[in-house]
A protein has these predicted regions:
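Conserved internal alpha-helix in NAD(P)-dependent oxidoreductase domains
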Residues: 37, 48, 55, 59-67, ...
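NAD(P)H-binding glycine-rich loop region in Rossmannoid oxidoreductase-like domains
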Residues: 14-15, 19-60
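Active-site beta-alpha turn of Rossmann-fold NAD(P)-dependent dehydrogenases/reductases
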Residues: 43, 81-85, 105, 134-136, ...
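Active-site helix of classical SDR
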Residues: 107, 111-114
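Conserved Rossmann-fold NAD(P)-dependent oxidoreductase catalytic core, especially the SDR/UDP-sugar
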Residues: 38-41, 66-107
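C-terminal substrate-binding subdomain of Rossmann-fold SDR/epimerase-dehydratase oxidoreductases
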Residues: 159-274
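Conserved catalytic-core motifs of eukaryotic protein kinase domains, centered on the activation segment
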Residues: 49-56, 91-96, 144
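NAD(P)-dependent short-chain dehydrogenase/reductase
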Residues: 94, 117-171, 176-187, 218-220
Length: 274
């Protein structure tokens, strides 16, 4: 499991944990000795649906992220990878490529999109390669308890009822291990592969897109049919009933990465980790 791999890496001296406040990345230069090759920035406050409309919090996230770029430069990093979001795209009914127009419907999506523009400009100024991931619904062991997958697992294994929206929109999930491998692929791909690309964005998603209700029903079956779903009993989240129809051709072509874990397999692994 991921936790076992982390424990082994830590024990073998390959993983060093440095704690630092998300809002003060400049302190990292005092805590990390020597230079670094790359910086992966996944820290972002208020990513849950309830906090996505808070403009002040999202503005603070953006400021801290830009300061993190400066800290990465001070640490000697040549590549900066930022975790953007599907929320940047907004409402679409067709396949989303990295060139699809963005019209975010929440302060969260707007701030992530501003980081894509301002982060790229700052990295160019500092001489760092900027890579912007647009991640589509990652799931797996250790996920936040309020996510759809975790809420389904809690309800169905506990033989409880779960209030949901209509779940008629198209959706896409990516298992956490596949996401980690995508990040690794983008970090290890030679610099020449990125030269000439006018857009630093890479969609990172699974290869299985279908109505959200079908994913929920699959989780229900894998939980042996316990509990039940109350469709249409809950209002939609901050972005509304958004369709997720990602195109992952770019990252597959540039890095050779591809998703490996079928949704059902990922759910089984998540159940086993509980």
């Amino acid at each position: 499991t991921g936790q076992e791999a982390e424990k082994n890496a830590f024990g073998e001296g390959r993983l060093h944990i440095v704690e630092n406040d998300l809002s003060a990345p400049e302190l990292l230069t005092e805590k990390i000795q020597g230079s670094c090759d790359a910086f992966c920035h996944f820290g972002w406050g208020g990513s849950g649906s309830g906090a996505r409309t808070g403009e002040q919090l999202q503005e603070e996230n953006l400021r801290a992220s830009l300061d993190t770029v400066r800290a990465a430069k001070a640490l000697g990093c040549r590549r900066f990878l930022f975790s953007g979001s599907q929320a940047e795209y907004g409402m679409h009914q067709t396949r989303m490529t990295e060139e699809t127009e963005c019209a975010p419907r929440s302060a969260y999506g707007e701030a992530k999109l501003r980081m894509r523009r301002q982060g790229e400009a700052l990295c160019k100024e500092l001489g760092i390669r900027y890579i912007h991931l647009r991640i589509f619904s990652a799931y797996g062991p250790g996920d936040h308890p309020w996510t759809l997958v975790e809420s389904c697992l809690d309800a169905f294994t506990g033989n409880a009822a779960l209030s949901l929206g209509a779940c008629t929109q198209k959706w896409n999930f990516i298992y956490i291990t596949d996401l980690a491998k995508a990040v690794r692929a983008l970090l290890e791909t030679p610099e020449a592969a990125f030269e000439g690309l006018g857009n630093p964005v890479f969609n990172v998603a699974g290869d299985d897109t279908r109505p959200l209700k079908e994913f929920v029903e699959e989780i229900h079956r894998l939980c042996k049919g316990g509990g039940n779903c109350l469709y249409g009993d809950r209002k939609e989240n901050a972005e509304g009933a958004v369709n997720l129809i990602p195109d992952i051709g770019k990252i597959c072509r540039i890095t050779g990465w591809k998703p490996e874990t079928a949704f059902g397999e990922g759910i089984k692994k998540t159940l086993e980790s509980r």
